[in-house]
Amino acid sequence: TKDTILFVGGGENESPAVWALSGNTTQKVSTQAIDDILQRLTADEVADIYGWSYGQAGHYFVGFSLPDTCLVFDTTTSRWHERQSRVTETTGAIDTISYRVRGFATAYGRLYVTDSRDGRIGVADIDTYTEYDSVIVRTMATQPFQNNMDPFFLPYLEVTIESGVGNAACPDPQITLQISRDGGKTWSDERARSIGALGQYNRRAVWRRNGRTS
């Protein structure tokens, strides 16, 4: 941000973390989950981390590109998320790589981005749901639900969404649900719900009969 610098670092014999430097004050901003990802890197991989930043729609993001993923901090909400890109190889197989965007620049009323894979220039648009013709897949995991360690039933689950956002590229966007009953080690089959075609603003994403926890 204007008065703050974010960086990856750590003292001697300390594991790397993300820190915010504001004036003469340093504050750790990475969570335990982010620290766990950074601690798996070698010293050379930590040295090769590439940072970038940009602002859009009232949010200011700072990203750190790693070999297999990209860690992004939203300074407006103080929340983290990961970004990756899906690319189609010459064999037709779909591969997942670290977020391919490496640079941002605002010009002519648009936010332009650079591409680390083949050098193309793109535009970051919050109303576009593809990345270089590949559909963007977003994954969110909730905090574990528990009832004082006792089993419980989950008869009804609804995700509050902005519905009716389909467009020509994705006329019927979907949201899918998977449930883990063993702490995230295994997951149920996907159950899909429509987010709503363009104009279906009252569409709701509801899952019923979700079973019992063990």
Predicted regions and their residues:
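Beta-sheet repeat architectures centered on beta-propellers
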Residues: K2-L6, G10-S214
